[in-house]
Amino acid sequence: MANITAAMVKDLRESTGAGMMDCKAALTETGGDMQAAQDWLRKKGLSKAAKKAGRVAAEGLIGALTSGKKGVVVEVNSETDFVARNEHFQGLVKMIAQVALDVGADVEKIKAAKVGSITVEAAIADSIATIGENQSLRRAAALEVSEGVVASYVHGAVIEGAGKLGVIVALESPGKTDELAALGRQLAMHVAAANPQAIDAAGLDPEVVKREKDVLSDKYRQQGKPENVIEKIVESGLKTYYKEVTLLEQAFIHDSGKSVAQALKEAEGKVGGPIKVAGFVRYALGEGIEKEETDFAAEVAAASGKK
């Protein structure tokens, strides 16, 4: 039997909003599997939403930079937020974004690229020596279109183009560049706020869609609903799900009375041509990284020789 810890119960509560005893039961029933426990709670109707429990704790900055038809977003991590506010580190992030715009999104190629007489990797090493704290280029992404624009938005910017969250959006269109750029920035802001998982339903991971269908089916099957009724409920539930997680079906944050798809269609007249979302990338600082928590009481006890 898996050892169910208080920390596991706490994490499940934070990600689902379910009660403590329900969370403990879910973890016990699923052998401590956090994802399976979230599904178990949803099937029992005990969780309103199964948001992924992503404890984001890494520090640093997200840098986003565009130039006409191409754009990049990079994540450079540091150990503390203090370093993220350091002008030298901020300059490093902007320099790395510029290099990525020139050479592409391959992290190893970025690190090997030269800026002046030294490589980016050497510049990072120099920054570590100067500031006295570890820093690293974690990831990078790039978008490019043959016709249209790539726009960006940085939320919580500490300097232009660098902050805690960065988005780039690629729009393909033969229309007016200035109008497209303004629309692209609005769309990038939408992506930052709404966090879509794909452009449309076709872009979603089939396994994720299957899991959603299974959760909905099992939930209503446990309630004793007939199979023909369950099929209709699941179909309706998936439509709602798509409106929540796909960009084109989400309510546009700048005009909630329209979907993003409708807003783009209406903008085509102003832009002067058809508009297609070719892609988007959203980087939130530290997502997927867990920062080691310090137990100060334990450290003090260890230092004093206490057990």
From Swiss-Prot:
* Region feature (Involved in Mg(2+) ion dislocation from EF-Tu): 80-83
Q: Which Gene3D superfamilies match?
A: 1.10.286.20, DNA helicase RuvA subunit, C-terminal domain, Elongation factor Ts, dimerisation domain
Q: Which GO terms describe its cellular component?
A: cytoplasm
Q: Where in the cell is it found?
A: Cytoplasm
Where is it chiefly localized? cytoplasm
CDD domains assigned to the protein according to its UniProt record, in alphabetical order: UBA_EF-Ts
The protein's GO terms of the molecular function aspect are: translation elongation factor activity
Q: Name one Pfam family in it.
A: EF_TS
Keywords linked to the UniProt accession:
Cytoplasm, Elongation factor, Protein biosynthesis
Q: What does this gene product do? A: Associates with the EF-Tu.GDP complex and induces the exchange of GDP to GTP. It remains bound to the aminoacyl-tRNA.EF-Tu.GTP complex up to the GTP hydrolysis stage on the ribosome.
Q: HAMAP family, from UniProt?
A: EF_Ts (MF_00050)
User: Which family does the record claim for this protein?
Assistant: Belongs to the EF-Ts family.
The protein's name in its UniProt record: Elongation factor Ts
**From which organism does this entry originate?**
Bradyrhizobium sp. (strain ORS 278)
Ranked from the top, the taxonomy reads: Bacteria, Pseudomonadati, Pseudomonadota, Alphaproteobacteria, Hyphomicrobiales
